[in-house]
UniProtKB/Swiss-Prot annotation:
Top-level lineage group: Bacteria
EC numbers, comma separated: 3.5.2.9
Entry-linked InterPro entries: Glyco_hydro/deAcase_b/a-brl (IPR011330), LamB/YcsF/PxpA-like (IPR005501)
Upper taxonomic lineage: Bacteria, Pseudomonadati, Pseudomonadota, Gammaproteobacteria, Aeromonadales
Quaternary organization: Forms a complex composed of PxpA, PxpB and PxpC.
Reactions listed under catalytic activity: 5-oxo-L-proline + ATP + 2 H2O = L-glutamate + ADP + phosphate + H(+)
One example GO MF annotation: ATP binding
One Pfam family here: LamB_YcsF
Protein name, per record: 5-oxoprolinase subunit A
Assigned keywords, A-Z: ATP-binding, Hydrolase, Nucleotide-binding
Function (record text): Catalyzes the cleavage of 5-oxoproline to form L-glutamate coupled to the hydrolysis of ATP to ADP and inorganic phosphate.
Family, similarity comment: Belongs to the LamB/PxpA family.
Amino acid sequence: MAQVDLNCDMGESFGIYQMGTDTQIMPLVSSANIACGFHAGDPSVMRKTLEAAVAQGVALGAHPGLPDLVGFGRRNMQVSAQEAYDMVVYQVGALAGFAKAAGVSLHHVKPHGALYNMAAKDKALADAIARAVRDIDASLVLYGLAGSQLIQAGKNAGLRVASEVFADRTYQADGSLTSRSQPNALLQSDEEAVQQVLTMVTEKRVKAVTGEWVSLDADTICIHGDGAHALSFATKVRAALLQAGVEIKAM
């Protein structure tokens, strides 16, 4: 039976500000990427999200981002490889502390937003992030954009890697995600998301916005927890995968 992980970015509320539909989505996914305070999240949100994931048997992941609360970590910043290493160690270490306090362990690390996209193309940043994950815990799985520098860096560091694809994002001909600054960056209908996911998982390819077919591996599928259609996408994507005989399970 084919198998794929279904992940969601979670714990992105901050103080009195609520983001996402974590409570409803948590039972639908197999792994959760929990914000660690730099782009979103705070200590209480981190703890509560981790506890909710544990209660549902969902694999725990750290979701480190750039220090940009106002921009939600989605704006590029000029950071050195050493700064990227330090940011990842700091944030993963914070969530690992909550995991230890709860008597559980982290399963994976997935960078967030601009840090994720920068590391997909910048070898030095990718290597620094992979090294940070390895130095914290070499058993952690590194999630990265399928076919990206981050996936290769993880392999080079001796880590297990999960090639990630996106249910709600469109793709360019080089396999990169369409920039969020473009009007066609996001898929708007459930039907489009379901069809794209099934094609990526069963055929290992995706159709770019320019019409070309792009080959890719699909170990894990991302649902963005802050997306307008996140709950609907998660519900229908999960149902379609199960109907197609695909088992939903963390790596």
